[in-house]
Amino acid sequence: MSVYDKHQALSGLTLGKPTPYHDRYDAALLQPVPRSLNRDPLGIHPDSLPFHGADIWTLYELSWLNNRGVPQVAVGEMHLNAESLNLIESKSFKLYLNSFNQTTFDSWESVRATLANDLAHCAQGDVSITLFKLSELEGQPLAGFTGECIDDQDIQIDSYDFNADYLATNEQDAPVVEETLVSHLLKSNCLITHQPDWGSVQIHYRGKRINREALLRYIISFRHHNEFHEQCVERIFNDIMRYYQPEKLSVYARYTRRGGLDINPWRSNTAFNAPNGRLPRQ
């Protein structure tokens, strides 16, 4: 369980409540969640972030009317800088996008600029938006995380409660390595509704070798944990830094879509490329 799931800052969210749908443009539908809610308990301060990164969103259900009344459709890609004051609550994002459905825009650029302006205002941070025609995406192959998958270890799991102390199981004389580890067993739950969130996570680091059994147990322990996607990734980054102090660390998670949106946060303390390739479950 999160220590802040009843915080006053969350009380006004539409998430988990019956909500009418609007098909006329309304930027006020967007709702922010302060990043400080999970960062403060982790000791992460906005003036000295231990990482850089972004939340990459894919917008699959985006439509509007052109100036002749003909519906237009696109797939959108948003990159929200991790230095923003707020993350964007996903149900409100879905409702906001739905408000474009019967709204007329003069051009694709007008749609893109409107999205970028509204989302940056809500998040209080830098946002980039790209819109793709469906023909630009046809035939694209499924992607995969590079790295060694740790999921096939022959271990016994008896607890599914979050426990960062699994990472305390490390070798004092472990050699320094640089490697990339991958797990597809990340599952957490929405902070508010407790609906399941399914994801894959890639961890690239340089430092003392991470105990792979300990890491897998740690990842599986998120199974009953209630936090938003972005918060889980920052918790993973913070916990690995706390227990292993790697020289370099990058954590990238890609979650399955819900409500026409998928969220793919990454955090890193080094140069890192986060390709937005769709994984098999996405």
UniProtKB/Swiss-Prot annotation:
GO terms for cellular component: cytoplasm. Belongs to the GTP cyclohydrolase I family. QueF type 2 subfamily. One of its GO terms (molecular function) is preQ1 synthase activity. It comes from Pectobacterium carotovorum subsp. carotovorum (strain PC1). Catalyzes the NADPH-dependent reduction of 7-cyano-7-deazaguanine (preQ0) to 7-aminomethyl-7-deazaguanine (preQ1). Its EC number is 1.7.1.13. It comes from the Bacteria. GO terms for biological process: queuosine biosynthetic process; tRNA modification. It is found in: Cytoplasm. InterPro entries: GTP-CH-I_C/QueF, NADPH_dep_7-cyano-7-deazaG_red, QueF, QueF_N, QueF_type2. Homodimer. This is NADPH-dependent 7-cyano-7-deazaguanine reductase. Pathway: tRNA modification; tRNA-queuosine biosynthesis. Substrate binds at I88, E89, S90, H229, E230. Its main location: cytoplasm. It catalyses: 7-aminomethyl-7-carbaguanine + 2 NADP(+) = 7-cyano-7-deazaguanine + 2 NADPH + 3 H(+). NADPH binds at S90, K91, R258, G259. The active site is at C190 (thioimide intermediate), D197 (proton donor). Keywords: Cytoplasm, NADP, Oxidoreductase, Queuosine biosynthesis. The keyword NADP applies. Signal peptide: none annotated.
